[in-house]
């Protein structure tokens, strides 16, 4: 199966899935507010299930990104580097290799960017994401106008 097939394939929620009040609250925040969220928890607590529930129920346009290729396959997303076309190295501030996104309309139409395992993402990559988005929207503040989960 290639990556596109894995991105398009629907994944069923776990058989024992129960929509708890906590899940409802988090989904409501993801769906109806402009709040940036940092969702954390130990292995098996339901983070991936929440992502799949959001993927199936949302009306939002969003991208799912991760730091590594293996992680991006697991969440049916893209790597940060491939999505933004970043070079595979440390990225300096105002790096000339941070260019306008290959398809600015894709970024302009996004309601949210979900970064899986965000705590593993280096600071230079977060800065590069911010710089790349600023080239699209002329933002003034860090990640202004984009929601991160």
Segments and roles (model prediction):
Residues 1-149:
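Conserved ATP-binding/catalytic motifs of P-loop helicase motor domains
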């Amino acid at each position: 199966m290639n990556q596109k097939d894995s991105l398009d394939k629907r994944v069923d929620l776990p058989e024992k899935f129960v929509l708890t009040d906590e899940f409802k609250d988090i989904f409501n925040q993801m769906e109806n507010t402009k709040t940036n969220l940092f969702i954390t928890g130990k292995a098996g607590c339901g983070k991936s299930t929440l992502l799949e529930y959001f993927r199936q129920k949302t009306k939002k346009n969003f991208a799912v990104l991760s730091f590594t290729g293996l992680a991006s396959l697991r969440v049916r997303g893209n790597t940060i580097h491939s999505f933004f076309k970043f070079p595979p190295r440390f990225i300096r501030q105002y790096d000339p290799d941070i260019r306008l996104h290959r398809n600015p309309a894709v970024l302009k139409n996004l309601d949210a960017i979900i970064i899986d395992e965000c705590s593993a993402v280096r600071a230079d990559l977060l800065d590069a994401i911010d710089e790349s988005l600023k080239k699209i929207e002329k933002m003034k503040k860090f990640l202004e106008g984009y929601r991160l989960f």
